[in-house]
Amino acid sequence: MTNAFVYPNVEFIAGVDEVGRGPLVGAVVTAAVILDPHNPIEGLKDSKKLSEKKRLLLAEEIKQKALAWSLGRAEPAEIDKLNILHATMLAMQRAVENLKIQPHFVLVDGNRIPQLPMSAQAVIKGDSLVAEISAASILAKVARDQEMIELDRRYPEYAFAQHKGYPTKLHLERLAQFGVLPEYRRSFAPVKKLLSTLLSKNHEYVFKIQK
C-alpha cells in the first residue's frame, strides 16, 4: 500500500480521514491514527472496500496496536451553521487535538487540510495509499455506522441501520412518511425541501382557518 507514497522524514505521523459528509442525518465523524512501525497491521485499505465484519476486526486491531488514535466529530447543528466542508475540517481538527501523542506531521485524505499547529499534507486517494489514513477511515466508518445502528434502535421506522443516513430511495420515502427528527441536517436539500413543504402546508392550513 505505502510503496507509492513517500513519507515525510519525521517520527510521529498521523493519518486523518472522515466518514459521513453525504448522509442527511447525524454527525460527520473523523479519526486520527498514529501507527506503530514496529507493530504492523495487515490488510489495511480504504474502509469502503472492506466487509463490515473485516472492518470491525481491523478496528479492534488498530485500537490495540496503534501508538495513538482518536475520534472527532461535528454535530448536525454545526454542519448546518458552518456547511459540511467547514464542519468536516473542524471535526478533523478535533480528532488531531484528541490524540494522546501530538504528531509531527499529519496526512489527510482528499485535497484539503484543516488548520493545524503542525505541518500537514493532503493526499488524493490517501485511504488507499497511506496506511495511517486507511486506519483512520476504518475507525471513523465503524464509529459512525455504530451511531446509525443506535439511532435505528430508537427510530426503527426510518431504517437507519440499512442506509446509514445516506439519501437512498428507501430513506427518502421514510423521511417523507415519518418526518424530520432532531438528528437531521436541516441545511441538506431533501430535508430543507421537506421542511419548506410542511411549513407551506401549515401556512395554508392556518390561512383556511382564519378565513
Swiss-Prot record:
Residues 11-200 form the RNase H type-2 domain. Its cofactor is Mn(2+); Mg(2+). InterPro entries: RNase_HII (IPR022898), RNase_HII/HIII (IPR001352), RNase_HII/HIII_dom (IPR024567), RNaseH-like_sf (IPR012337), RNaseH_sf (IPR036397). Keywords: Cytoplasm, Endonuclease, Hydrolase, Manganese, Metal-binding, Nuclease. Its EC number is 3.1.26.4. It is an enzyme of class 3 (hydrolase). Disulfide bonds: none annotated. It catalyses: Endonucleolytic cleavage to 5'-phosphomonoester. Manganese or magnesium. Binds 1 divalent metal ion per monomer in the absence of substrate. May bind a second metal ion after substrate binding. It is found in: Cytoplasm. GO terms for cellular component: cytoplasm; ribonuclease H2 complex. GO terms for molecular function: manganese ion binding; RNA binding; RNA-DNA hybrid ribonuclease activity. CDD domains: RNase_HII_bacteria_HII_like. A divalent metal cation binds at residues 17-18, 109. Its main location: cytoplasm. One of its GO terms (biological process) is DNA replication, removal of RNA primer. Endonuclease that specifically degrades the RNA of RNA-DNA hybrids. Belongs to the RNase HII family. This is Ribonuclease HII. It comes from Histophilus somni (strain 129Pt) (Haemophilus somnus). The gene is rnhB.
